[in-house]
């Protein structure tokens, strides 16, 4: 990451450090520019594509290995793809009428139930 990118990254971290999922979902909706006839389908396909990009970056990291400096670069690239995954999750949740915070809470509840039943350790 060059100096300008680092400064921009630090600015963004400071500006949004206390952001809640609901705030993110509302702000992300401003960028959901696709035909309403493709609501649900468009973000679902985008989510699959971006998740694939995360997997591909991790695969290349495993294949190529990395020294400490390139590890930080690859980590930043993976983080950017995770951000894209988050955007598509927010768009899909909006199109389905769900709040990300409610989905996150329901997911944690489900995971806790699995842990309590000894299904995950």
Positions of predicted regions on the chain:
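Flexible "arm" and connector segments at domain edges
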Residues: 1-121
């Amino acid at each position: 990451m060059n100096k300008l990118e680092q400064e921009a990254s630090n600015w963004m971290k400071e500006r949004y450090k206390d952001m809640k999922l609901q705030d993110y979902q509302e702000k992300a909706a401003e960028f959901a520019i696709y035909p309403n006839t493709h609501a649900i389908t468009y973000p679902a396909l985008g989510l699959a594509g971006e998740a694939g990009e995360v997997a591909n970056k991790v695969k290349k990291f495993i294949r190529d290995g990395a020294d400490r400096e390139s590890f930080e670069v690859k980590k930043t690239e993976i983080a950017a793809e995770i951000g894209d995954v988050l955007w598509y999750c927010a768009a899909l949740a909006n199109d389905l009428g769900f709040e990300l915070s409610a989905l996150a809470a329901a997911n944690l509840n489900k995971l806790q139930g699995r842990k309590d039943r000894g299904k995950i350790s």
